């Protein structure tokens, strides 16, 4: 019988509706915004519905692709260039700038040393976690029962977190003892439930994936000798694939990034040895019959189509190769020769954006499983980690609804604002806030 995930998810507000934090200056008393309103004069726009001037300008550029290409090229050359302010500084000031660069270089060397020592410290304590993770695996799979002391400590923690009285807890415990099943071992569906409570991962899990993931008995991690880590998914014998473990390895670059952190380089997956095409949840099979017009014989044709699946996680996308300067120059020449082929350029941009999104999601999944799921697996199973994840969402849904209503009400006054004189002055706002 297929184990089903336990529904422990708790309802939360939509995170997309969370308000954007604002940084308010400590004081705006001396701000010019308080002393007087902006003095830029306004220009009364004519009510020319035809928009003849703008349309004529746009039409002129559209009919002159050479001029349009020249303008775009000039604007593109300006991107990323400095204004020249540093070059025009006096020599003594430049020397001070060089001195600050030297100080920053020494600071970055210390940051690199800090990150390397921090990684070694993480590895040291990770080794101390291992006996606890081994015992967790044994309890989940029914190989070991927790001690009386561990049960009492866990009950006390739950009572403190949820504010349960001891007497009420004892009554609930008696009811649970009456419903106990002696044949049930371990915690069924533990890792499937924990994964489905982790929102980023749950979005990649399909119904077919759930049946496979119900055979998952452990998720663990190992550090590499080089910067990076490996995720290990262990399964009990099942009808889907022959592998006992599936691995995903993340590699970082040897050199630290500008911010002083390790920079992601690439990821390696593993080959899943599916027992049959029907059990491969990463594809869909479409079968149709064809009849030969001459011999009248029929044959069955199969079409295998890749489909969305959590198990695509073990076949990660490959980042694009870094191009050399010679390759960039060749690309520029090729771009000039193919300037009129806009459709192919747009398709290439879309493919690059899609690849970038896939790489970002793949890295995010690995980091969340490593940093959030494995250390706090029991909280993701019970759903408690969901509340710790987004505590600020509680009670903010109504505020968003009221703000939407205010926005609709303000639209009624738009016509009145348009009738005001262009030169009239308005009082400055009482406070300036920056987003």
Swiss-Prot record:
Region feature Disordered, mapped onto this chain: 1-51, 146-187, 308-435
Comp. bias intervals (Basic and acidic residues): 356-374
Keyword Thylakoid belongs to the record: no
Phosphoserine: modified positions: 16, 27, 31, 35, 46
GO cellular component: a single term: cellular bud tip
GO BP terms: budding cell bud growth; hyphal growth; NLS-bearing protein import into nucleus; nucleosome assembly; nucleosome disassembly; positive regulation of microtubule polymerization; positive regulation of transcription elongation by RNA polymerase II; protein localization to cell division site after cytokinesis
Subcellular location: Bud neck; Bud tip
Modified residues annotated as Phosphothreonine in this record: 20, 24, 29, 42, 52
Mutant lacking the gene: phenotype: Leads to constitutive filamentous growth and abnormalities in both septin localization and organization. Exhibits greatly reduced virulence in a mouse model of systemic candidiasis.
Ranges of biased composition (kind: Acidic residues): 146-185, 338-355, 386-421
Gene3D superfamilies: 1.20.5.1500, Nucleosome assembly protein (3.30.1120.90)
Record field: compositional bias (Polar residues): 19-50
Entry PTM: Phosphorylation is cell cycle dependent and is important for its bud neck localization. Phosphorylation is highest in newly collected G1 cells, declines when the cells are traversing through the G1 phase, and reaches the lowest level around the time of bud emergence. Phosphorylation increases and remains high through the rest of the cell cycle until the beginning of the next one, when it decreases again. Phosphorylation involves two septin ring-associated kinases, CLA4 and GIN4, and its dephosphorylation occurs at the septin ring in a manner dependent on the phosphatases PP2A and CDC14.
Keywords: Phosphoprotein
MF terms in GO: chromatin binding; cyclin binding; enzyme activator activity; histone binding; identical protein binding; unfolded protein binding
Similarity comment: Belongs to the nucleosome assembly protein (NAP) family.
Known partners and oligomeric status: Component of the GIN4 complex which forms a ring at the bud neck.
UniProt function note: Acidic protein, which assembles histones into an octamer. Involved in the regulation of the localization and the function of the septins during mitosis.
Name of protein: Nucleosome assembly protein 1
Species this protein is from: Candida albicans (strain SC5314 / ATCC MYA-2876)
